[in-house]
Amino acid sequence: MHPQKNAPQIDAMFLYKHRKNVHKKDATTNQISFDFNNWYTHALAQSPTFTQTMQLTGEQMAILQSQGNIKINAVAGSGKTTTLIEYARSRPPSARILYLAFNKVVKQEAAKKFAQHGLHNVQVETAHSLAFKHVVPGRGYKISPHGYKTNEIADILQLSSGGEKHAEFILASHINKFVSLFCNSTAQKVQTLDYLSTIADSKAKSFVQKHHEQLLYYTRLFLSRMDKAEIDIVHDFYLKKFQLSAPVLPYDYILFDEGQDASPAMLEVFLKQHACKVIVGDTHQQIYGWRHAVNSLEQVDFKSYLLSSSFRFGPDIARLACEVLDLKSHYATHTKVLIEGKGTSEKLQTKAVLARTNLGLLLKAIEYVTESKKIKHIYFEGNINSYTYADDGASLYDVLHLHQGRKLQIRDKLIKGMKDMKELEDYISKTEDMQLGMMVEIVKEYGGRIPHILKSIKDKHVGDEERDKAQMIFTTVHRCKGMEYDAIQLANDFISQEKLEKLNDPKNRNKPHPGKLNEEINLLYVAVTRAKKSIHLPEEFLPEGFPDSPHIHVMRNAIAEKDATDASRNHQQSHEKEKAYDVEQVRSKHSDAYKPWTPELDDELTVLYCEGVHVKDLMKHFGRTRGGILARIKKLELPELYD
């Protein structure tokens, strides 16, 4: 549990004063170890209220008492940062401690927290910031901050098509991925890696087999040119250089956070150090396998500890999270996870829509900006432009111009080289470029309405400094990892039990790898565990037989992914009102259209309205017309009371 704000600080000075009692020196090894029991006894003597105000759980206490290398499997919201702070504070005050954070944002937050607790002996880094300091200065390297576009690699390496349509761009795309695979691996040489095994699509696999020698040659050439500083280096390149240099780091303790998504290259550096090692993470939050990350918690034989209580959410959301993970039993042996939900939050300030993909998120954002007049300010986690641009640099507008035959207006060289959408889709299948694939789907869905829709989204979007003004936050699961919101809504692009059963059907010849299914379920688990107070989710994501809960709102009759697309194509004007001249026709479409509103239904409508649920979803949920929903909202004076 998190310490209370007024908790007494058992700081480095206190430990120094009592060093004879709390630290032991081994006469044989000369190593200093920490005696938790003596520290705790002296802390209690120093402050009689220590045990009451610190409120550490038994699991946290066990971690503080530990000696040697350990790994901590910590469920979502279990106070792992608090635990690591207390762990660091309980070590010798002269100990040199390195905390490895997952990304820059987490690094900045962690640095503040350690400093606030007087732990100035803790250095906070990310894997990349640490590697940068050891590799880049003084070597003449320049960084390519956003990596390389496919057409840039084709130009740098002077690739040719060889008579095969767009082969130079397809090859460049695979070179980019091969470089990423090598830089994140522990391999000493590129040629020892099996790149082909990472490819799933049959067309892409066929291309790689046919051009394997070229792919290997040009990948090595591209890496060599970066190494010689002939071209700018990518971030993963200096991480790889760091690993290959076999560094010896000057720390007594190294704390490795988010260990379930570790770069193999950085993990090797970590494991080779002589320091006392701590890995913390959540096995079921592994969602970066596509970026070659591995679950280090499963790769080391350190003594294992648990943090199984979540202080973010209560028992109902905890149960839902556990039952989501039970989906893994459909394709593998699964040990049931138990999470104790101890959260008691009743606030309703931050509301967020979470999706698995950029496409799913944009579709929900489009619904909000075109249908909901009350939404004035929205916020996208991360740069809003990143949702309309592929990593390669191609924009949604480029794909739209290709779709409309306006090639002169296309800026991206790769898209400009495509004859038509069919050629682009063929390229996508040979490269497994999922982001471009999503853009194609959006363009097919909304066509010429896209410029107006994107303008509406950007007009309502607030910057980072005004994030608190946002009435709704939009984010993918990957972008909100480590974050939390009072109320969340899930888009319908996650995996469901029904989808899982179809994919895992013995008759399915293209059954996905269990590791990919694992990450799909993990994505749903991570999404569910971002909520502090309440969740709104399509009914297909609710486990069968799950009990009613005031914190879990099921959006009945939610449209499935394909149905949503079909419905949207038929829906020419987003503000078009339903023409319901025939009562029976309306009743057949909206089963409860003319049933009276009860106090219970009014209460439910009020809750859903306050938590930002979209009118379209309210229509499906209550089985009523748009006009019926809006009339009841007006009757209850909800805009006046809650907007």
Provide a role label for each language-model segment.
Residues A27-G140, C322, T529:
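P-loop NTPase Walker
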Residues P48, L56-Q65, N69-I72, H211-V294, ...:
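Conserved helicase NTPase motor core
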Residues I72-S78, S94, F102-V105, L130, ...:
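Conserved helicase motor core of SF1/SF2 NTP-dependent helicases
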Residues V105-L181, S372, I378-Y389:
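Conserved P-loop NTPase-based nucleic-acid remodeling module centered on helicase motor cores
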Residues G140-F222, K407-I428:
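ATP-hydrolysis module of ASCE/P-loop NTPase motor domains
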Residues K347-I473, V477:
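Conserved helicase/translocase motor-coupling segment
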Residues V440, K444-T475, K481-A487, N492-R569:
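C-terminal accessory regions
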Residues D617-K620:
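Short alpha-helical "recognition helix" segments of helix-turn-helix
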